[in-house]
């Protein structure tokens, strides 16, 4: 494989893990951060592939800055951010595609806990987008004996799976923090999947994508690991800590907190049923206790399971 020049925007644990994978495949990696020594212009000088691994809140400003630099249309943009923009309700890749309409824009998402990837533990992910040549290029860049990369044309579904599961991870953290048991956790995760699918398909994603790595896979990883920041938010809320206290002590961004707010706004506008996410939202706003959130879900109207699985 020929050497590819890759620029990674964001030097947090996720950006660093992706950089390590690319370097292990003998590609040239340049890392940029807001506080780093390189300017954006310097970091992008040779970039053939641009990987964006910053938090959602920084995406709009960064996109505006990059737009001034006039990227070559051959540069592949890979979004590795999970979230929704509160101002526009758009996903990260939608922002990038609107900013660079002539560039291939892809999404990389899956059950990828950064610390495990840094330790070279086996993992798999999905790179998604409509440009098959670009997708296969990025697949080759990161694939290795410890990191298996699959492709998918459903860019939006892949992206939404990784975004929406962060909200559910908060709820599962609450479940674990309250010591509700394995049965409760299994029920919560299982009922969360159709909730994610309802939102995802309403917005244009394909239902089957949510049964893959970027949907169910990421949901399982994030909802069952204390390494997940979103899980930790829910767990510590159940332990009686306040949200500001939790976020202040958290190492990194829990995207699920912002995503919950945006998701509820979106669901209200579009009339999408999201009972689990709605209780997470009420909890994050301090309107109910973790125990009250549980009671609200358990006391809902009884119904057949099949009526809303998809």
Swiss-Prot record:
List of catalytic residues:
165 (proton acceptor)
Query: What pathway does this protein act in?
Result: Membrane lipid metabolism; glycerophospholipid metabolism
Annotated residues for binding of sn-glycerol 3-phosphate: 82, 110, 165, 218, 228-230
User: EC number(s) for this protein?
Assistant: 1.1.1.94
Q: Which reaction does it catalyse?
A: sn-glycerol 3-phosphate + NAD(+) = dihydroxyacetone phosphate + NADH + H(+); sn-glycerol 3-phosphate + NADP(+) = dihydroxyacetone phosphate + NADPH + H(+)
Q: Name one GO biological process term.
A: carbohydrate metabolic process
Q: Does the keyword Oxidoreductase apply?
A: yes
Primary place of residence? cytoplasm
Q: Which residues bind NADPH?
A: 14, 34-35, 82, 114, 229, 255
**This protein's name:** Glycerol-3-phosphate dehydrogenase [NAD(P)+]
């Amino acid at each position: 494989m020929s050497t590819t020049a890759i620029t990674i925007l964001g030097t947090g644990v996720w950006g660093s893990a992706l950089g390590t994978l690319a370097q292990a495949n003998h590609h040239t990696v340049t890392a940029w951060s807001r506080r780093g020594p390189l300017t954006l212009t310097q970091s992008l000088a040779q970039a053939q592939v641009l990987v964006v691994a910053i938090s959602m809140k920084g995406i709009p400003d960064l996109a505006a800055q990059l737009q001034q630099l006039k990227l070559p249309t051959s540069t592949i943009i890979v979004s590795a951010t999970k979230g929704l923009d509160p101002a526009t309700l758009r996903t990260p890749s939608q922002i990038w595609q609107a900013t660079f309409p002539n560039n291939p824009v892809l999404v990389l998402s899956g059950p990828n806990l950064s610390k495990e990837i840094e330790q070279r533990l086996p993992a798999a992910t999905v790179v998604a987008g409509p440009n098959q040549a670009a997708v296969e290029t990025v697949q080759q860049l990161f694939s290795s004996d410890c990191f298996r990369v699959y492709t998918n044309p459903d860019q939006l579904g892949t992206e939404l799976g990784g975004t929406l599961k962060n909200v559910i991870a908060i709820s599962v953290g609450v479940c674990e923090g309250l010591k509700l048991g394995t049965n409760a956790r299994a029920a919560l995760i299982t009922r969360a999947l159709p909730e994610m699918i309802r939102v995802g398909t309403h917005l244009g994603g394909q239902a089957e994508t949510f049964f893959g790595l970027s949907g169910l896979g990421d949901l399982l990883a994030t909802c069952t690991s204390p390494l997940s920041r979103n899980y930790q938010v829910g767990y510590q809320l159940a332990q009686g800590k306040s949200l500001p206290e939790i976020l202040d002590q958290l190492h990194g961004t829990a995207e699920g907190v912002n995503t919950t707010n945006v998701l509820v706004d979106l669901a209200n506008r579009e009339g999408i049923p999201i009972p689990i996410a709605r209780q997470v939202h009420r909890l994050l706003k301090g309107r109910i206790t973790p125990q009250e959130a549980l009671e609200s879900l358990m006391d809902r109207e009884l119904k057949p399971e099949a009526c809303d699985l998809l």
